[in-house]
Regions:
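Solvent-exposed loop/turn and edge beta-strand elements of beta-rich ligand-binding domains
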Residues: 1-243
Length: 243
C-alpha cells in the first residue's frame, strides 16, 4: 500500500512511511448462539449465518477513489440463500447500506462491490463494512475433519497518489462448518447382516428429544445418518426384524 504525504525539510532526515492496509475477517455464527466464530458444526438442512467484517486503512481519506470488492466462495456442500445484506458500522450504530452494493453470484462465488467506496454515504476511516448472509448445508457437504470451508478476500485500492488502477488483495479469510456421519449396521448374533430393521434418530434439544431422521424397514442392513452436528443423540430401533 501507498501513503500520501507532504514533507518539507532543511537538513538530512530519515522518514518512516506507514503503509496501512484494510483488513477482512470471515466468521460463521456458532450453532445455538448469537456469537460469530471461525468454525462451528451444523446439520444438513440447516441455514447457516455468515458474517464478513472489513476495516479501512488509516489513509482512507487520502484516496480520491477507493476500489472495494469482496469475493466470497461458497463450498459445494452449501446452497446460497440469496440474502446478502451490507451494513455500515460507525460509532456504535449500524445502518443498512445494501442499496450501494450490487451483488452477483456466479460459479459459487458471491461478488459484493460498490465499485468506488467513496460514493457510499457516511463511510469514514473509522467505519466497518459488515456483510451478512445465510447458506443451507446440503447433501453434498463433506463429512468429518476437513469441514466445509467458506473463503473470502478483499480487492482494494492501494495507492492514493493518483494511480486509480493500482490494487492489492487481503489474505484469504476462512470460516469452516463441520458436519458428521453415524453409520449403523444391523446384524444377527452370528454377525451376519440382518435386513428389515427400521431406526429413528433423535437429538436432545432444550432437554427434549426431537426426531432428526427416520429409516424405514426394508432390505437394507446398513443405515447412514449423514450431516449431524455435535450433541446428545438417541437411536431407537422402531422396526424389529425377524431373526
Amino acid at each position: 500500500a501507498y501513503t500520501r504525504f507532504m514533507l518539507q525539510v532543511a537538513t538530512d532526515t530519515t522518514v518512516a512511511v506507514k503503509a496501512d492496509v484494510p483488513t477482512l475477517t470471515k466468521q460463521v455464527q456458532a450453532n445455538g448462539s448469537q456469537n460469530y466464530t471461525a468454525a462451528t458444526e451444523y446439520r444438513i438442512g440447516q441455514s447457516i449465518p455468515f458474517q464478513i467484517t472489513a476495516t479501512l486503512p488509516s489513509n482512507y481519506a487520502d484516496f480520491p477513489l477507493y476500489k472495494f470488492t469482496i469475493k466470497d466462495t461458497i463450498p459445494v456442500g452449501m446452497t446460497y440463500n440469496n440474502d446478502v445484506r451490507v451494513y455500515l458500522q460507525e460509532g456504535g450504530t449500524e445502518k443498512d447500506i445494501s442499496t450501494f452494493f450490487p451483488i452477483s453470484y456466479t460459479g459459487n462465488v458471491i461478488t459484493i462491490t460498490p465499485g468506488d467506496l467513496k460514493y457510499v454515504q457516511g463511510v469514514k476511516v473509522s467505519s466497518k463494512i459488515v456483510i451478512r448472509y445465510t447458506a443451507r448445508l446440503n447433501d453434498d457437504a463433506v463429512m468429518g475433519a476437513l469441514g466445509n470451508p467458506n473463503i473470502a478476500n478483499l480487492t482494494y485500492s492501494n495507492n492514493p497518489n493518483g494511480n486509480n488502477s493500482s490494487t492489492a488483495e487481503t489474505p484469504d479469510t476462512k470460516a469452516n462448518v463441520y458436519t458428521y456421519q453415524l453409520k449403523v449396521n444391523k446384524v444377527k448374533e452370528n454377525q451376519e447382516a440382518l435386513a428389515g430393521a427400521g431406526f429413528t434418530l433423535y437429538k436432545k434439544v432444550n432437554n427434549q428429544y426431537t426426531e432428526i431422521k427416520k429409516f424405514k424397514a426394508g432390505s437394507d442392513s446398513t443405515f447412514d445418518f449423514k450431516g449431524l452436528d455435535s450433541g446428545d443423540y438417541k437411536l431407537v430401533e422402531s422396526t424389529i426384524p425377524s431373526g
